[in-house]
Amino acid sequence: MGQELKEKAPPNHIGTIIFQAEEQIENTPIVELGKAFTLRFDDLNADEAYYYYTIQHANADWTASELFKSEYINGFDEVRIRNMSNSSATLQSYTHYALNIPNRDTEIISSGNYVLSVFDDKQELVFTKRFVVYEQQANVQVGVFRLRDLEGIDSKQRIEIGVQTAKINTRQPDQEISVWALQNYRWSSARKIPKYDYVMNQSLRFEYDNNLIFEGGNEYLFFDTKDIRSAGGNVAYIRRENLYQSILYPNYVRNGTVYTYAPDINGNFVIQTTEGFNPNTDADYTEVTFRLRSSETNYDFYVTGLFNQHLPQPVHKLEYDSANNLHQLTIRLKQGVYNYKYIAIDSAGQLFENGVGGSYWETENEYLALVYMRKFGDRYDRLIGVGTVSYTHLTLPTNREV
């Protein structure tokens, strides 16, 4: 088995990586074959450096596929990102880069999993991002429900997946079809659903496997820095030094408390500014200070969200302030609305995803099902269908196809 192609976090001078498909708000490209998507990022060195990109095809399990580049790209990659512009009237200078695909050099021609890598002019890897390209072949339905078992009934959610096979010519679906599911577009939550449970009306039904059960988690916390000069949502106060500083209200450990509904964007972020017309180059950066009220010192606490690819990185570790009985961290983020959460890691390196926020069956989450096909003799996994479902305890589960 090959090595999994994981996402690599960028260095500190690279900020605000946005990776979106056309007409999607999710900051994770789920792209229909032939449609467009865009990568954006800022270089806070602001020196108009040259960056280059490559694209690698992967199997359903994110190991490198056997395809030659000419089999999944029309044209070529290893091309410089030419679209760049400098920030305008901001305290923090930066160069903004944008890569649109397809472009005159690169067109994706095969479905499946992909990893886009960005390199500097010394050919050193800067960061990587995953994306998927699908063919609209299989109709995929996803439902989400409260767990039936008493163990976990208050903290977990269960999904069910149906894959219509009428339009996909398969005689051995147990060998040719593979299904993966993930929560809130987080690749770290992805798991394979080993086998369908039964067939009904030409639909493969996945309903009983334990990999269909997810911790509900809790609603993400949020803050709003659209107006850099005044305190927005969950910002306690603003002060000005070299940059504006946004000091957030202290958060508390929610694990063990009663669930409270609060609308969120499932860990995402949206760049916005009240000053300027183009947030890509007019939005400024602010020093955001996170504060977690806790006397716990047996765990390391990290702040995560899509803004740092949900990865607990050393630069996002909170430091304990014994005088004020809280853990805090200051990082530089572009103006906008952000979701975030705290995670805990013990001295043995074990990660507790919901140790701070708790886990509740009522939590609103979005689930994504990816359906792959590899027929006998094929050399790669085609992504033939995608389905999503959003769940909130205030409404019935709703299905939508991508």
Segments predicted by a language model, with ranges:
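Short, compositionally biased P/S/T/A/G/V-rich stretches that sit at domain boundaries
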Residues: 1-32, 135-150, 264-276
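Basic K/R-rich, polyanion-interacting modules in nucleoproteins and related proteins
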Residues: 250-297
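Conserved small/polar residues in nucleotide/adenosyl-binding loops
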Residues: 392-398
